[in-house]
């Protein structure tokens, strides 16, 4: 049936990005990576979720290094809801993946999920098979100062990053309030 439920226009606007952070249980990170390589990535694509980047922390405590971080692109915030609903109800996911013993009890805590709105600061995600180091930066400013931060980033920061050999991969604002009023996320 067609979806005729009235919604706020904002939830149909897009694209939106979703930053997800998984904390793997001890001795389970390898199995989590295998699940993504063998099943999850393909099922994301099947359900209209576009993987933008996957990475692992290189520093921090042993627990912090067991995190698995990724970004998905969705056509809209509402589409993200629909995509996740279809994904979690997919018979291949429920019976073909989650029932395998090697893929059970992979996480030590509930996944973190932050929706992000793109901004007009250049950034690219060129596909590369070369190992790379990425830096995820979250900048929080006083309420009302986010446009100033964006302007400074666009006019100065990006140029300086490129001058010093850093490659901006993307910049986003938090989608949901209250963070959307003062938070910018950047991937270098």
Question: Which residues does each predicted region cover?
Answer:
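Short S/T/G/P-rich N-terminal loop/turn motif that feeds into the first structured element of a domain
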Residues: 1-95, 101-188
